[in-house]
């Protein structure tokens, strides 16, 4: 029963708020609807002006083929000095083709 009363009070409050907005004035900012439209229109035009020409993106100078850095933000790239998923895959496939017992032993670890 209490929730029904709470919902009814919320409906009345929202109805009152929408009526105030439709009249053109709000209590919070005391601006009329036309003043709000003008102020928001000015902000839109400023944002359009700031979205003007941008500088083109430049490719990284060192190691342009591997632009993804390793975890932790270091400057080391994935292809240099670390095991990548591709290299691990190649390692497992190579040894499983030429040494079948390696694959059976490796599957136990996974």
Curated annotation (Swiss-Prot):
Principal place where this protein is found?
A: cytoplasm
Pfam families reported for this sequence: SERF-like_N
The annotated regions of Low complexity compositional bias extend over 34-50
- Segments for region (Required for SNCA binding): 11-17
| Family to which this protein belongs | Belongs to the SERF family.
This protein's assembly is summarised as: Interacts with SNCA; this interaction promotes the aggregation of SNCA.
Q: Where is the composition biased (Basic and acidic residues)?
A: 1-30
What is the name listed in the Swiss-Prot or TrEMBL entry for this protein?
Answer: Small EDRK-rich factor 1
Domain of life of the organism encoding this protein:
Eukaryota
What does the UniProt entry list as the effect of changing residue 16 to E? Inhibits SNCA binding
What effect is documented for mutating residue 13 to A? Answer: Decreases SNCA binding
* Region annotated Disordered, chain positions: 1-61
Q: Which keywords label this protein?
A: Cytoplasm, Nucleus
GO cellular component term, pick one: cytosol
| Annotated compartments | Cytoplasm, Cytosol; Nucleus
Q: Which gene carries the instructions for this protein?
A: SERF1A
Q: What is the effect of changing residue 17 to E?
A: Inhibits SNCA binding
């Amino acid at each position: 029963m209490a929730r029904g009363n709470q919902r009814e009070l919320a409906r009345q409050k929202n109805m009152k708020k929408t009526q105030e907005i439709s009249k053109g004035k709000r209590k919070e900012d005391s601006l009329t609807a036309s003043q709000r439209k003008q102020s928001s229109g000015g902000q839109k035009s400023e944002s359009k002006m700031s979205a003007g020409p941008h500088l083109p993106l430049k490719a990284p100078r060192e190691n342009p083929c591997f632009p993804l850095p390793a975890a932790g933000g270091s400057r080391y790239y994935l292809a240099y000095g670390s095991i990548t998923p591709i290299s691990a895959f190649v390692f497992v496939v190579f040894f499983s083709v030429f040494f079948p017992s390696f694959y059976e032993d490796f599957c136990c670890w996974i």
